[in-house]
Swiss-Prot record:
One of its GO terms (biological process) is defense response to fungus. It holds the Pfam family Defensin. Its main location: secreted. Belongs to the DEFL family. Disulfide bonds join 37-86, 41-64, 50-84, 54-85. It comes from Arabidopsis thaliana. This is Defensin-like protein 69. It is found in: Secreted. Residues 1-19 form the signal peptide.
Length: 96
């Protein structure tokens, strides 16, 4: 019985620690995601919706593409889908 109480207490402490925002108390209100596609961008590609789609994609001819051009030297199985150029993205913290 004592070990089950200890397990429940430990689980609650872990859950509270994970859900508690540690950075709020020190004034960090946003995080910056570095761009993955940024060379030769033009104004038509620079908007928040494009930036959201572009993170993590490959870059080619002024835009992001999916899938990446080659994986381990093999050509892609699917056609390229051009995406938008990226600027650094400022993400606001999740709302409570």
């Amino acid at each position: 019985m004592g070990s089950s109480k200890l397990l429940v207490a430990f689980t609650l402490i872990v859950m509270m620690t994970i859900s508690y925002d540690l950075f709020t108390g020190i004034g960090i209100d946003a995080r910056t995601v570095p761009p993955t596609c940024y060379e030769s961008c033009n104004a038509t590609f620079q908007n928040p919706e494009c930036n959201k789609m572009c993170v993590g994609l490959a870059y080619k001819d002024g835009s992001c593409i999916y899938p990446p051009p080659e994986v381990d030297g093999l050509p892609p199985k699917r056609p390229y889908f051009p995406r938008c150029c990226c600027n650094p993205i400022i993400l606001s913290p999740p709302s409570p």
